[in-house]
């Protein structure tokens, strides 16, 4: 009988602990599969873009307290998404501390805009106006940092996304934009969006940047949604057009033959059985003899 069963009769604590670690490792791998999915990476890039829009709107527009609270809540949700992506990339690197040192420029993008506004108001109440100016400079730095985060995220996602990913992203942009604008604009008597069809028409026109101008948002939050739909629509449509042109190029010109790198060759050889390896060596020798005989 093992020591652990003698100490804990009828159960194996260490075995359960090992199984728990194995299950945890499997869950981490599953989380990795989710985080590295092209649509998730595209969603992270859109979250970075929307976070830039939120900070720009908060910095340039005079919003009432109710709208500011909603804006800060949206920003907090976006920052949580960016934090999750950053934490996963740091874990995946194998050296989280080293990764943080290399990506210090991304840290300002992870600061909620509401926290900066809270600190700024507190410092203004104490009369520390120089520090208030410093915080306003940090807000500009926040915009720049989140903008660079968006560019790096969209570049990473562009290598993996396919046609149906982009088509789905365009459709989701239209549907979510229509839903959001309808919820925000319908109660306003001055808004021209009076039905679901008006909202859907507005979302399609805005996402494709046609902009007829017959249906426009009237509320500040509606205008923020309009900016988000325009920018996300432009990004998705640009990538979609590039993907379609690449597909036609492959059809007309043909795909290049994949090269066999030394790493792929070593992996192929290591996966062979003894008989397959011997057959592989004999084939190579026959090819060498054939090549020498043709010289």
Swiss-Prot record:
It is found in: Cell membrane. Residues 64-67, 106-108, 185-195, 209-221 are extracellular. GO terms for molecular function: identical protein binding; voltage-gated potassium channel activity. Keywords: Cell membrane, Ion channel, Ion transport, Membrane, Potassium, Potassium channel, Potassium transport, Transmembrane, Transmembrane helix, Transport, Voltage-gated channel. Pfam families: Ion_trans. InterPro entries: Ion_trans_dom, VG_K_chnl. A motif (Selectivity filter) lies at residues 209-214. The chain crosses the membrane at residues 39-63, 68-92, 109-125, 129-145, 160-184, 222-253. It is a multi-pass membrane protein. GO terms for biological process: action potential. Disulfide bonds: none annotated. The keyword Transport applies. Its main location: membrane. One of its GO terms (cellular component) is voltage-gated potassium channel complex. Residues 97-105, 196-208 dip into the membrane without crossing it. Belongs to the potassium channel family. Mediates a strong voltage-dependent potassium ion permeability of excitable membranes. Assuming opened or closed conformations in response to the voltage difference across the membrane, the protein forms a potassium-selective channel through which potassium ions may pass in accordance with their electrochemical gradient. Contains a central ion-conduction pore surrounded by four voltage sensors which form the voltage-sensor paddles that move in response to membrane voltage changes through the fluid membrane interior, each voltage-sensor carrying their four positive charges across the membrane. It is thought that the S4 arginine residues move through the membrane's electric field to open the pore. This is Voltage-gated potassium channel.
């Amino acid at each position: 009988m093992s020591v652990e069963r003698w100490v804990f009769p009828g159960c194996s604590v260490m075995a359960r602990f090992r199984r728990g670690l194995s299950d945890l490792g499997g869950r981490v791998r599953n989380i990795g599969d989710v985080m590295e999915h092209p649509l998730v990476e595209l969603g992270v890039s859109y979250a970075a873009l929307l976070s830039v829009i939120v900070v720009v709107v908060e910095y340039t527009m005079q919003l009432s307290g109710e709208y500011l609270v909603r804006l800060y809540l949206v920003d907090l949700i976006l920052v949580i998404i960016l934090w999750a992506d950053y934490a996963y990339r740091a874990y995946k690197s194998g050296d989280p501390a080293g990764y943080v040192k290399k990506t210090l420029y991304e840290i300002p993008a992870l600061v909620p805009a509401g926290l900066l506004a809270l600190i700024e108001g507190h410092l203004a109440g104490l009369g520390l106006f120089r520090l208030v100016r410093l915080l306003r400079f940090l807000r500009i730095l926040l915009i720049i940092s989140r903008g660079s985060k968006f560019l790096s995220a969209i570049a990473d996602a562009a290598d993996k996304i396919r046609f149906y990913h982009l088509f789905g992203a365009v459709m989701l942009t239209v549907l979510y934009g229509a839903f959001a604008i309808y919820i925000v604009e319908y109660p306003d008597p001055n808004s021209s969006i009076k039905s679901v069809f008006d909202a859907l028409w507005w979302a399609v026109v805005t996402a494709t940047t046609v902009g007829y101008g017959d249906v426009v948002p009237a509320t500040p939050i509606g205008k923020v949604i309009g900016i988000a739909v325009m920018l996300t629509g432009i990004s998705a449509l640009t990538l979609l057009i590039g993907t379609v042109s690449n597909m036609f190029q492959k059809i007309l010109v043909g795909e290049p033959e994949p090269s066999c790198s030394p790493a792929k060759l070593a992996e192929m050889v290591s996966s062979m059985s003894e008989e397959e390896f011997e057959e592989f060596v004999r084939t190579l020798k026959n090819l060498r003899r054939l090549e020498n005989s043709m010289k």
